[in-house]
Amino acid sequence: MRLVIAQCTVDYVGRLTAHLPSARRLLLFKADGSVSVHADDRAYKPLNWMSPPCWVTEQDTETGVALWVVENKTGEQLRITVEDIEHDSHHELGVDPGLVKDGVEAHLQALLAEHVELLGAGYTLVRREYPTPIGPVDLLCRDELGRSVAVEIKRRGEIDGVEQLTRYLELLNRDSLLAPVAGVFAAQQIKPQARTLATDRGIRCVTLDYDQMRGMDSDEYRLF
């Protein structure tokens, strides 16, 4: 991973155009090929980013200022004009073991993948653990109309789970082969604050009855 703190301007050129005026920012160049631009706020969210695969070229402008061009396979570009570099370092992090789900969450995922129709009539499973540059989506499905649906599964549904699914949706909806991608937040229990946030973001909530999904008697299975 390469970490750069620099005074820079950033322009996105592609399906849309976006401009970030000159400011000190953190630039992340990851080993997977992704590049992201961060400010000292917005928590985990980058100001702009480019998903892998993408390629970086460094050029000199007529004014002598460095121009870093990040381009993906579709020709979209992040054009980073670097005015001054405060820090530039490389770090080898190695292979991350990834997030290990607890036993109940892992079993919920397996059961829901097997009985994906519990999410709605006509739902089909595309893949478990669908890979993205920021981690795997628990389930990627298609609804009765063939539209993509990303499903995040938790034992207890809290705000951080909704935020996690939001990050996946932001990334997946940039893929023209998948977009538009809807979201489903599925858990045994969903806290009111998490449900409110999910609803506000257009994410559907599903309450799962673990006992029923294992084949035990229960009258508590509900879809919301």
Swiss-Prot record:
Source superkingdom: Bacteria
CDD domains assigned to the protein according to its UniProt record, in alphabetical order: NucS-like
Residues annotated as transmembrane: none
Pfam family, one: NucS_C
GO cellular component terms, semicolon-separated: cytoplasm
Assigned keywords, A-Z: Cytoplasm, DNA-binding, Endonuclease, Hydrolase, Nuclease
InterPro entries: Endonuclease_NucS, NucS_C, NucS_N, NucS_N_sf, tRNA_endonuc-like_dom_sf
Entry EC number(s): 3.1.-.-
Keyword Magnesium: no
Protein family per UniProt: Belongs to the NucS endonuclease family.
Known function: Cleaves both 3' and 5' ssDNA extremities of branched DNA structures.
Name under which the protein is recorded: Endonuclease NucS
